[in-house]
Curated annotation (Swiss-Prot):
NCBIfam families reported for this sequence: ATP_synt_6_or_A, PRK05815.1-1
Protein's UniProt keywords contain Aminoacyl-tRNA synthetase: no
Protein name (Swiss-Prot/TrEMBL): ATP synthase subunit a
Lineage of the species this protein comes from: Bacteria, Pseudomonadati, Pseudomonadota, Gammaproteobacteria, Alteromonadales
Function: Key component of the proton channel; it plays a direct role in the translocation of protons across the membrane.
Biological process, per Gene Ontology: proton motive force-driven plasma membrane ATP synthesis
Amino acid sequence: MAAPGEALTPQGYIQHHLTNLHVGEGFWTWHIDSLFFSVGLGVLFLWIFRSVGKKATSGVPGKLQCFIEMIVEFVDNSVKESFHGRNALIAPLALTIFMWVFMMNFMDMIPVDWLPWLASLAGIPYLKVVPTTDVNITFSLAIGVFVLIIYYSIKVKGVSGFVKELTLQPFNHKAMIPVNLLLETVTLIAKPISLALRLFGNLYAGELIFILIALMYGTNLLLSSLGVTLQLGWLIFHILVITLQAFIFMMLTIVYLSMAHEDH
């Protein structure tokens, strides 16, 4: 499926599915589809958990309540095992990150042509439905975590303690302050960059594989049949990938914030 005036070639098909619906140019470009799906899924997550929380009973819970309680307990145990400070906000934050990232990743399970085709009927030429295949979204999440790291580092250790952490580690000598500052600054900045690029790279690669498999349906009968098998196999494997990436993002956030709460 291609946008109007776009050649229906393998290259055009791939390019079409990797192009965001956007307004503006350069630095001021807004990816409308990424914003729509990320915000929409965030609202959906809040609505589901709030609804279940309001209807929760101490008696025999329903299937959805059981599922939500399993997730909450899993995240709570992960926080207890990895976070060594005192902060009541870390568990809710970890739950939000895990569920939000997972739900954005889960959009990759929808066949690549379905939603773009529906959008084309409404006159929308491009539509990327997986927010985490947009590096702007993954960096936004990572920068949010980075801001929390800086905030809690200063709150727990004070400005002087935070500066000492950057200048007197790993070599505790005044002569090594420039070296320490360089090493610690690089380490600090690498945290959000690695968070963002790891999530983006894995989901972008997964989406690209789905697109390449979808191309096989437009060839001969043999490759079309093979495409069905490949898509099913990759779909099953990708469920593990999207869950693992959400878990890794959550766990690294917990670990980084735990380090920020350590007062040496």
